[in-house]
Amino acid sequence: MKKKVKLRYDRIAIFAVFCFLVVFLFIKSITFLFSKINPKTEKYFLASISNKVNLYDKNKNKIKEENRGQEVFLYVDTIKDEYSKVKYQGKNYYVKNEELSKEYSDVVLIKDLYVRTATVLLDGISVLNYIPKGSKLEVLGFDEIDNNGNVFNYKVKYNNQVGYVNKEYLVGSKEESLINYDQNGNYLIHKARTSSYGGNAGDLDFYPRQKGNFQNNKMPDKVRALYLNGEAIYEAKDYIEIAKDSQINAFVINIKDDVLSYKSGVAKEISLRSYNNALGSIEKYKQNIELLKNNGYYLIGRISVFKDYAYALDNPNNAITDKNGDLYKHNGSYWPSAYNTNVWEYNLKLALEAIELFGFNEIQFDYVRFPDGTNSLEKDGVIDMKNNYNISKIQAIQTFLMYATDILHQKEVYVSADVFGESAHTYVNSYGQYWGAISNVVDVISAMPYPDHFNINQYGIEEPVWTNPYKLLYTWSKDFAMKRQSEIPTPAIMRTWIQAYNTTKTPAVEYNAEKIKEQIKGLEDGGAVGGYMTWNSVSSKSKYREIANSM
């Protein structure tokens, strides 16, 4: 009896094992079949040193290129030594394993980059450091990738500081970073130029740059502008009345000209004296700006950058000082140092604030220079320019303009820079202006060749030059400014300041409508056809009425 019971149990056990094996094999086969029908995948991203990744067929023949950063689905059971199978946009491809990343933040595979164009290390718009040409950077990541797989800004480490650098200024090798852009041998022309204590042109950057061209912010083909100082803007209605029956289509309006035109929130945080000394309120300023905008005028916001009495008093460590450490006064004002990146940031913040509050079409930087006539004082140690990065004056000016232009272009706003008429000559001047280094960077270069600023017989002109503004400005534009424009790959629009005030030199000359016409014709006959702006520091209504129809 016991044997029969034991035999029955054995049979049951064998049957149970058999059933388990059948079920197990059935499940395995179903799983296998399911995996063939619907194989397991995981999300990955295409990664590369460059902006493109190659996709292959099963025989490892290249089929197409796709942008770095694109999402794919990796077939987990296909991972091989070199290639893996992925699904992308509903189709199957093979990709090199090294060009697949589990994390989107790791899709940029390059480890080191080199600085082709001297630039700055940024945290937002804050400047952390100046980075010279040829410097090596450790790549830690990026901020964004565009639709073509290109990085906007690389996250890098430099001198133990972490920040971001514009991709346009970086290349893959040390050798490439040391090359100077030499279009048609023009770099050798710059390199041979003399320096007047402002730096060497051969140390500057002349690579082509993308100029502003914004669909939602169209610049007039030719700007014809009146200048409004910080007080005149509050009487915008009167200036509209003056301009309405003329060809005037724009206004240059002070944001800051040593004194702020309105009580800026940026200034309140950084320079309380500037805030307290402001000429008016944001509300009143905005009302007048909107009146101009509603009448169809193109608006240019003017900021005097490195001449700022109140800012220097509030921030003396950022300003030029004498040998005793006291603020140095030049031409009635204190000067923040153009070497100091805190000063750069303050003025850029003012520009960004003005764009947000008032909708300026363009930001114009004036006094983008060091104080003139001070090179002997600097050489003798009488003054301290605060050159913390050991760079030349023109290197500081060019880098500031690159920094500001890059950020303002993100706001779809144009950038212009004012320069002395002397800057069209063939040397780096002592206050840090060199035509090619500035025109190549900004959208508009605005020289100030006021006839009464020239020597009496400049350029061999027999009569006092301010008595014949046509001949003077024709010669200046044709033989100097236009030649400087031809020496760079991406010159700015040349929109020139013209003198709209009477000359008090001997012989005195009234700059009436006829003299305005002579200046304009001289510029345009000499090739400077990008427009003009009237300089009259007091924005005289009577003078503007007199000359409006001559523009």
Regions found by a protein language model. Name each.
Residues 57-68, 119-136:
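SH3/SH3-like (including bacterial SH3b) beta-barrel domains
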